[in-house]
């Protein structure tokens, strides 16, 4: 089993958001030395407790500070961006760190509704087809497979290179797993969001998987919230503030 880290860049009491970002880089360096496989950073906006608002920038910092880790987003919230812009951004990251960049994608806003509107000034209600269409466009842009009759067929994503970021679809529901399977992409189940039904979601992913140019068999991982300590009592003590912060809605600093 390969162990990886999903870092939400929590802000400690008495520390600043800038401190939290620097601590994320330091933690990634330690994880690199300990043999962890992947290091993903999250996207949240307007949060009083989480500092990671620009994962694409933090990924570059972490990849530059480490030697072996695969580094990526867990994830980029696609509702805020165009597929082309995300493809270009992660192609740039891959140009500097070929074969080490992961692109995890999600559909949640990572914010409250007002902040989501501020992120997208031309905000309009998003149809159910919007996210799957973005994923298809993004995969085509990344892999230079835009169909010849598509309005975007003449667009070339720069830079291009010998490697491509590894795309992962993130989710906590069977619909997310089914979409990842239908698209033929790796799937990451967010157990830390939905602690129930993970086995059923992964089975739905495997059952609906269709081989793609990027992946010929299902590939998945699971994100869990973990507290490590010398004793169970100490682990419970460390976990309690996080539980209270989560139950309060995440606004207060952990």
How would you name each of these model-derived features?
Residues 124-157, 196-254:
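An alpha-helical appendage that flanks or caps ligand/catalytic pockets
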């Amino acid at each position: 089993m390969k162990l990886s880290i999903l870092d939400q860049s929590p802000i400690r009491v008495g520390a600043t958001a800038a401190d939290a970002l620097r601590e994320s880089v330091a933690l990634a360096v330690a994880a690199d030395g300990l043999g962890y496989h992947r290091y993903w950073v999250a996207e949240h906006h307007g949060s009083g407790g989480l500092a990671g608002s620009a994962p694409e920038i933090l990924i570059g910092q972490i990849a530059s500070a480490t030697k072996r880790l695969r580094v990526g987003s867990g994830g980029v919230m696609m509702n805020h961006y165009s597929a082309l812009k995300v493809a270009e951004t992660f192609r740039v990251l891959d140009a500097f760190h070929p074969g080490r960049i992961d692109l995890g994608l999600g559909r949640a806003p990572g914010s409250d509704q007002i902040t989501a509107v501020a992120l997208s000034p031309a905000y309009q209600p998003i149809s159910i087809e919007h996210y799957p269409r973005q994923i298809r466009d993004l995969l085509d842009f990344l892999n230079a497979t835009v169909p010849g009759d598509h309005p975007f067929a003449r667009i070339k994503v720069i830079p291009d290179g010998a490697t491509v970021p590894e795309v992962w679809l993130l989710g906590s529901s069977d619909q997310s797993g089914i979409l990842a399977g239908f698209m033929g992409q790796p799937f990451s189940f967010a157990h830390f969001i939905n602690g129930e039904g993970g086995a059923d979601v992964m089975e739905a992913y495997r059952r609906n998987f269709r081989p793609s140019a990027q992946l010929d068999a299902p590939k998945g991982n699971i994100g869990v919230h973990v507290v490590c300590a010398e004793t169970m009592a100490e682990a419970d003590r460390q976990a309690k503030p996080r539980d209270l912060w989560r139950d309060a809605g995440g606004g207060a600093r952990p």
